[in-house]
Amino acid sequence: MISSVPKLQYYKLRDGASVPEFATEGSACFDLRVCWDTEEEMWGPIKGRNIKKWKKMLVPTGLAFNIPVGYSIRFHPKSGLACKHGITLTNCEGIIDSDYHHEVFVCVWNTSDENDYYLRQGDKICQAELVRNEHYHIEQTTEKPQKTTTRDGGFGSTGK
């Protein structure tokens, strides 16, 4: 029997890169970790980098992926980082396409108005999943979309 389970391959670009892995048997996503560029950045006086409050940072993972055609990798914030420290993804969800074969970086944002946050070598920075892409046609129409339900309004129109 031929397996229909896709295979996601990774390549370590630097020795310090961490293996992407699922935290538990029931985890929907695997974790990606910080991989700084040089020994000085990894083991220097602060052993990491400081994200100032309300600032953004592009964080290297040290990994490149061989993503199967027809799939993409989607990044999501780590709930603990977001709730406890205000660290989230700048773009809410990151997407890595199957034709991207370079190092994967994660763009994070410190939304805290109270504290800076130190990212150290090997810290979990986001969770990611392999997602099947659905391709579809996009075409212009000459007819304005018609109302198909009783809904009126836009933002906030469905209530609390």
Language-model-derived ranges and their functions:
Residues 1-160:
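DUTPase catalytic domain/fold
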